[in-house]
């Protein structure tokens, strides 16, 4: 599947240090092989999350388009606020 990202995700990764980027890259590599490996987000169709020590990676699987859309990489509280704002 092809990986795409939102502008929110792009802003989130700019804030990361080297260790954070390496950790995120490992998660994205796993997701690209098995896109539905994360925890399904309640009330959001085909949206999944994977938790790290301090943040959560949120992505949407668009099966028909063959796309994994990386939505955000934020702490827990920010994730839920941003999901409400995005209205997925």
Task: Describe each region flagged by the PLM.
Residues 1-27:
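Arg/Lys-rich, positively charged N-terminal/basic patches that mediate binding to nucleic acids
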Residues 2-4, 22, 52-56, 60-88:
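Enriched for short, Lys/Arg-rich terminal
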Residues 8, 36, 78:
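Residue-level recognition of oxygen-bearing side chains
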Residues 8, 46, 75:
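Residues that form or immediately flank small-molecule/cofactor binding pockets and catalytic motifs
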Residues 10, 47-49, 58:
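Short aromatic/hydrophobic contact patches that present stacked aromatics
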Residues 12, 27-30, 82, 86:
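Residues that form generic nucleotide/phosphate-binding pockets
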Residues 27-51:
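A short, surface-exposed loop/turn module that caps and links secondary-structure elements
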